[in-house]
Amino acid sequence: MAKPAKRVAVTGAAGQIAYSLLFRIANGDLLGKDQPVILQLLDLPQAQAAVKGVVMELDDCAFPLLAGVVITDDPKVAFKDADVALLVGARPRSKGMERKDLLSANAEIFTVQGAALNEVASRDVKVLVVGNPANTNAYIAMKSAPDLPKKNFTAMLRLDHNRALSQLAAKSGKPVASIEKLAVWGNHSPTMYPDFRFATAEGESLLKLINDDEWNRNTFIPTVGKRGAAIIEARGLSSAASAANAAIDHVRDWVLGTNGKWVTMGIPSDGSYGIPEDIIYGVPVTCENGEYKRVEGLEIDAFSREKMDATLAELLEERDGVAHLLKN
């Protein structure tokens, strides 16, 4: 017997990331090949015609799992009974825009969306914020949804995780699928800290295999941190397909489990690893039965502490920059 359809809300539905995302969701890549989905698509009033065009294409794919589509400019319609909410739309940084202006423009969007989720979404809704600054946007949405569990709100660090995996595979000559126990700590920004001290490939320590601290500090960490900028430089457009792929990975693993493998998610801190509570911070997790669980008890050396504190300082600055815009 067919499963009842799950409702997946996607914001920024007319944008480039959504264009790479929606067809894969409708194809079963997000929630499984036996799980029908209803897409609930949100974008601005001026983007509604473009969203309709995307939906025409979705129709033309005749996806067996696509049980329905809603198009709206009202967050309360888009998030109604949503099981998953992918918050992709955000205000991009325009030329000459100060970071604080970007923060307040996004605070406005994510307070409204957080409040709408609070009011109408499923109480078990899984929220992934993709739109930048993702960690702080997720924090704003979480703080604007006091009736939903904090653990429902996450930010995407999976793109950074996947970028780090690919760099490590290239350097070590090992298949990307063989690499386990990678962590990416902190903010989805160039301050993030990709950490392969615990990582293995085919059971061997990557630290021993690569054995090049200079490469780690001066090539690997900056390459992962600045990869988004390098793609804009090369392509003239920001990474969209790889971001959509990471969003699929993040939610699929959260829902269907990681079989004990570590992945990175931006989640509300519980105070461990010296991160203040509620800050949405990238940490290694495993997922099982629809829940994520942080990997605990990892040793933090002096270099790692310095890196983790630097990315935390940026997150605290962002949090303080939006504090006056939040009621709670």
From Swiss-Prot:
Going by the record, the broad EC class of this enzyme is oxidoreductase
One Gene Ontology term of the molecular function aspect: L-malate dehydrogenase (NAD+) activity
Domain of life of the organism encoding this protein: Bacteria
Q: Write out the catalysed reaction.
A: (S)-malate + NAD(+) = oxaloacetate + NADH + H(+)
Q: Kindly give the Pfam families that the UniProt entry links to this protein.
A: Ldh_1_C, Ldh_1_N
Q: Which Gene Ontology terms describe the biological processes this protein takes part in? A: malate metabolic process; tricarboxylic acid cycle
Q: Which SUPFAM superfamilies does the record associate with it? A: LDH C-terminal domain-like (SSF56327), NAD(P)-binding Rossmann-fold domains (SSF51735)
What keywords were assigned to this record?
Answer: NAD, Oxidoreductase, Tricarboxylic acid cycle
Q: What is its EC number?
A: 1.1.1.37
Q: Where is the active site?
A: H188 (proton acceptor)
Its annotated function is as follows:
Catalyzes the reversible oxidation of malate to oxaloacetate.
NCBIfam families, A to Z: MalateDH-SF1, PRK05442.1
Entry's family note: Belongs to the LDH/MDH superfamily. MDH type 2 family.
What is this protein's record name? Malate dehydrogenase
Gene symbol here is mdh
